[in-house]
């Protein structure tokens, strides 16, 4: 327990809160070629690589991911949710925050049904999360 005098000399430091998705908090001024502070719920980007990766132990699968260059020129790894996708290199995608627990380094999700990303076909439940239209009938 510090004395009052010690606290006067060197006050307590408050904890710095770190963002879970830092690339969404950076904008880019292309005219001045500088990064700016600009928080956004989603960001647009171009897929530079689409592939699969294996999760950490004890899980086993081939999880789909895309490497995306955002509109603020930052490159991030984003997860492609749902069964099947139509993404390829140079597809324009929308990303949101949200990590994938068993994929190290994946802190973003691609929004299905937005821009070049198609919704999940034949999905009946939880459709809004996968950009699926309401079935006829």
Curated annotation (Swiss-Prot):
Xref: NCBIfam families: rpsL_bact
tRNA-binding found in the keyword field: yes
Residue numbers carrying 3-methylthioaspartic acid: 102
Family designation: Belongs to the universal ribosomal protein uS12 family.
Keyword Ribonucleoprotein: yes
GO molecular function, one term: rRNA binding
Protein name as catalogued: Small ribosomal subunit protein uS12
CDD domains tied to this protein: Ribosomal_S12 (cd03368)
């Amino acid at each position: 327990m510090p004395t009052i005098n010690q606290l006067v000399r060197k006050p307590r430091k408050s904890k710095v809160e770190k963002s879970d998705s830092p690339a969404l908090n950076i904008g880019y001024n292309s005219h001045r070629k500088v990064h700016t502070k600009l928080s956004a719920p989603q960001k647009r980007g171009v897929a530079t690589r689409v592939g699969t990766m294996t999760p950490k132990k004890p899980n086993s699968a081939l999880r789909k991911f895309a490497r995306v260059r955002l509109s603020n020129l930052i490159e991030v790894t984003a997860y492609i949710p749902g069964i099947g996708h139509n993404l390829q290199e140079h597809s324009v995608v929308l990303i949101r925050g949200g990590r994938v627990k068993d994929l190290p380094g994946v802190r973003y999700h691609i929004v299905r049904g937005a821009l070049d990303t198609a919704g999940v076909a034949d999905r009946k439940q939880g459709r809004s999360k996968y950009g699926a239209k309401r079935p006829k009938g």
